[in-house]
């Protein structure tokens, strides 16, 4: 048994999410957990921030985020019930197997019963979650609690930022720069155009403006290729984990009429350069196993496939 699982059962309490101060502690939890495990044991802070934005843009946060604290008041774990429905939970390594996972699932099932009674059409689908291929403990937990592998999967990719990074070649007619306040409408619109009707694409201008105020957001790492008339043609959000010196890319997108021009390649290279300036030593990105075009692009700029995330669905 790993050292971090040798513990007496702690006194854990749970409560609803109360505000951005809790979000900051959730980010701290992810960075601490990664420092004690590996690059794939838990979500990256960038994944949490984007998932939080989408959740809080559509759902009441207090009803869809649950926190667990130890006897000293330290955040030990959290769970998010998102649209889909899907659940994400993260637990500090020393508290894995201490009951938070069961508590999170029980909380989600209780909330889903309430939501389905209130709006059966919106919440009718089976509960989903996910696990990485090398996370035997989570896979065993899901199997024991009635989940089975679903249809969707992603490849997880990583690239070292050591050594020189090729210069970004920006196609004629575009400017590559950080997103500014004046770009909020076009940046949010780009998200809607590329990803809607997925919930990730249902982002208003006001929602995106709020993202820019959250802890963990770094404006210099929110990149876009912009046309002369101010249209965000392509975008890339880069996120730093300053504790573990690993960056993350996502979301990554380009409007259809601006594709096949090299914009995403330029943004990826510039994102790497800026992450390196912010002290990152490596960067990760994920994409669907069937999205061969995205995989080819990431491989072409030095990423390697090192892991796989698999959807798991509850019930038969």
Spans of model-derived segments:
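Conserved hydrophobic beta-strand within the GNAT/NAT acetyltransferase core sheet
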Residues: 127-129, 249, 283-287
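Acyl-donor-binding surface of acyltransferase catalytic domains
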Residues: 1-7, 79-172, 311-314
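Conserved active-site tyrosine of GNAT-family acetyltransferases
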Residues: 138, 142, 298, 303
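A structural microfeature
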Residues: 77, 151-153, 233-234, 307
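Flexible, substrate/cofactor-facing loop regions flanked by secondary structure
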Residues: 163-247
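Conserved donor-binding loop and adjoining core beta-sheet/short helix segment
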Residues: 15-23, 31-118, 131, 228, ...
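Conserved acetyl-CoA-binding loop-helix of GNAT-fold acetyltransferases
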Residues: 97-114, 254, 260-277, 282, ...
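Short amphipathic alpha-helix that is part of the acyltransferase structural core
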Residues: 1-51, 168-202, 231
């Amino acid at each position: 048994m790993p050292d971090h699982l040798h513990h007496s059962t702690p006194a854990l309490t749970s409560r609803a999410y109360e505000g951005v101060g809790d979000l900051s502690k959730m980010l701290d939890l992810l960075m601490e957990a990664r420092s004690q495990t590996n690059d794939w044991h838990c979500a990256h802070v960038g994944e949490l921030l984007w998932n939080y934005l989408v959740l809080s843009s559509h759902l009441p946060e207090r009803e869809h985020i649950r926190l667990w604290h130890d006897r000293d008041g330290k955040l030990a774990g959290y769970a998010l019930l998102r649209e889909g429905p899907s659940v994400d939970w993260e637990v500090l390594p020393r508290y894995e197997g201490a009951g938070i996972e069961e508590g999170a699932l029980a909380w989600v099932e209780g909330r889903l019963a309430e939501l389905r009674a209130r709006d059966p059409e919106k919440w009718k689908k089976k509960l989903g979650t996910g696990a990485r291929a090398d996370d035997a403990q989570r896979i065993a937990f899901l199997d024991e609690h009635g989940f089975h592998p679903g249809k969707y999967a992603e490849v997880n990719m990583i690239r070292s930022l050591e050594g020189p990074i090729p210069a970004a070649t920006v196609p004629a007619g575009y400017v590559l720069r950080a997103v500014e306040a004046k770009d909020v409408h076009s940046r949010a619109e780009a998200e809607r155009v590329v990803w809607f009707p997925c919930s990730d694409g249902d982002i208003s201008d006001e929602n995106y403006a709020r993202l820019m105020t959250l802890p963990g957001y770094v404006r210099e790492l929110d990149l876009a290729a912009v046309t002369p008339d101010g249209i965000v043609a392509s975008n890339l959000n880069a996120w730093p984990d300053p504790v573990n010196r690993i960056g993350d890319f996502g979301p990554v997108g380009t409007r259809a009429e601006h594709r096949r021009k090299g914009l995403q390649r330029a943004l990826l290279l510039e994102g790497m350069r800026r992450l390196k300036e912010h002290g990152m030593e490596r960067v990760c990105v994920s994409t669907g196993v069937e999205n061969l075009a995205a995989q080819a692009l990431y491989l072409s700029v030095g990423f390697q496939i090192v892991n796989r995330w698999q959807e798991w669905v509850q019930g038969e």
